[in-house]
């Protein structure tokens, strides 16, 4: 394998010394970039973009050409697993993802096939290996999956939801059915992420996008427990290097203590949890990642710089000099001016020298 030229992202996740704060951005390959929109137009639709190795590689690399990022993240979708399980993923303009089939009964769960990620999601593995090769050791490649709870919400609801009516109905009225579904999904995610690691992913992020919709006990029982199972089942070393794992529960800042016990190397934060507070809670036991409000990127250069510096001041307030990766608190939005993320990235690298130099 090609020697990694810039490994500060991996080192920060493992709480090893770094020369400057590493940064990447959730959804860094996306609709805010004109070159992404052009490539998507060539592909014809979003799913075709994900399933074409050449296009998926191209859009993964696009933000790295514009910004001095410290990691690339596989361009794909969190709903590849439910699609491979036969639910029939499709997208309607302005309405987000939908499925032709839902999973709402014990029989529906029993009918789900066992996932063979290398065969059933070979297009993802082809993309990972192609991107890893194209990066040439420039920066590490992040692989990812949705959490079982988050995947289950889409499968039970039949698409996006704000209230999670059917999923929560299952949770309270038929918890054994939901547990069976979540267990099946945890096994699927383990297989999927290990296949990504075999294909070349050098770090893993689990996106628990809807974990924050749960109450405390339900979060632990129906979301965190299954992420714990996944982490325990992952390869943690490849080619002589540890494969760090990041858990990101949007709206999960109040659950840092139980998340620390998950076995993850790092916890992602959204913008509702102050970094200095989180640093004090974790006390160096895990790294942290985050947590600029993506809306900050709508502002002027001066306002972006001010917000980024305040974020870094919080991150290093307790004197720790590593164990931190800068990021947004959620995905970058399609309305951001492509010039603005450069201010974010460059300010992180330049200002963090004050603490790390």
UniProtKB/Swiss-Prot annotation:
Subcellular locations according to the entry: Cytoplasm
GO BP terms, alphabetized: protoporphyrinogen IX biosynthetic process from glutamate
CDD domains per record: URO-D
EC number: 4.1.1.37
GO molecular function annotations of the record: uroporphyrinogen decarboxylase activity
Origin: domain of life: Bacteria
Catalytic activity, reaction form: uroporphyrinogen III + 4 H(+) = coproporphyrinogen III + 4 CO2
Site (Transition state stabilizer): 77
Keyword Lyase part of the UniProt annotation: yes
Role according to the record: Catalyzes the decarboxylation of four acetate groups of uroporphyrinogen-III to yield coproporphyrinogen-III.
Record-given protein name: Uroporphyrinogen decarboxylase
